[in-house]
Amino acid sequence: MQRLIEGLQKFREGYFSSHRDLFEQLSHGQHPRILFICCSDSRVDPNLITQSEVGDLFVIRNAGNIIPPYGAANGGEGAAMEYALVALEINQIIVCGHSHCGAMKGLLKLNSLQEKLPLVYDWLKHTEATRRLVLDNYSHLEGEDLIEVAVAENILTQLKNLQTYPAIHSRLHRGDLSLHGWIYRIEEGEVLAYDGVLHDFVAPQSRINALEPEDEYAPHPNSPLISYDAFKVPGKERPGREKATESPAPQLSPLPGFGHLPREQAERIYRGSR
């Protein structure tokens, strides 16, 4: 605590003093252009990894960067998203998971949490779709490899869950909003972004040259909205598989989870999206 109190003084005398104009501007209101949804993990700092300024990001943090499907929970996530979209007119949403995620480790052994961590157990049940998908389709993996897959699949699950919210679904239909999935790899200081055409997590820096300076916060035409199934494990190439050289038009699924969930489960979880 002493270190934090000393930090308060250093902040005021250092950073605040040299950025008075910024804080004067922020005192009159906020105008973030990005909604950043990430994990509560202390190793993840959105402003640090993006090198963004105070006021650039509107942040939602919770264990596992989870967004329950519309109507499934009465937590603050839905309210925060509604405020971001309606009041702040944000047009970009990033869901950012990270390597070595404790929430994903817990998700893979969910039943063992029920007695000792009942609130965590109840929370992680909101991403049962991720757990079932990983256990059913990646039985050949274990340890950190399995956790790595869970982190990636969970990001895609949350992108689908976002689409079950009417305000988001409507804006996506109009082309007024983009969704992005990121993985922050702590040990490498690297961020990978999901590419809906390649079905892979790739370095987002490869897209920078395609953006005009004035469009840096505009909805991105390659936003991963639909084709989430069959992604490649980050950093691992699948034998005999080549990356696409062209960008085919995305094919809409009847339901957000239709690509890799049983239809009955997809309807139960995502029926609010249509």
Curated annotation (Swiss-Prot):
This is Carbonic anhydrase. It holds the Pfam family Pro_CA. The lineage of its organism: Bacteria, Bacillati, Cyanobacteriota, Cyanophyceae, Synechococcales. SUPFAM superfamilies: beta-carbonic anhydrase, cab. InterPro entries: Beta_CA_cladeB, Carbonic_anhydrase, Carbonic_anhydrase_CS, Carbonic_anhydrase_sf. Reversible hydration of carbon dioxide. Essential to photosynthetic carbon dioxide fixation, supplies CO(2) to RuBisCO (ribulose bisphosphate carboxylase, rbcL-rbcS) in the carboxysome. It catalyses: hydrogencarbonate + H(+) = CO2 + H2O. GO terms for molecular function: carbonate dehydratase activity; identical protein binding; zinc ion binding. A hexamer formed by a trimer of dimers. Interacts with the first 260 residues of CcmM; both the N-terminal 206 residues and the C-terminal tail contribute to CcmM binding. Interacts with full-length and the N-terminal 249 residues of CcmM. A probable CcmM-CcaA-CcmN complex as well as a CcaA-RuBisCO-CcmM complex can also be isolated. It is found in: Carboxysome. Its EC number is 4.2.1.1. Residues 234-245, 261-274 have a biased composition (Basic and acidic residues). Zn(2+) binds at residues 39, 98, 101. Belongs to the beta-class carbonic anhydrase family.
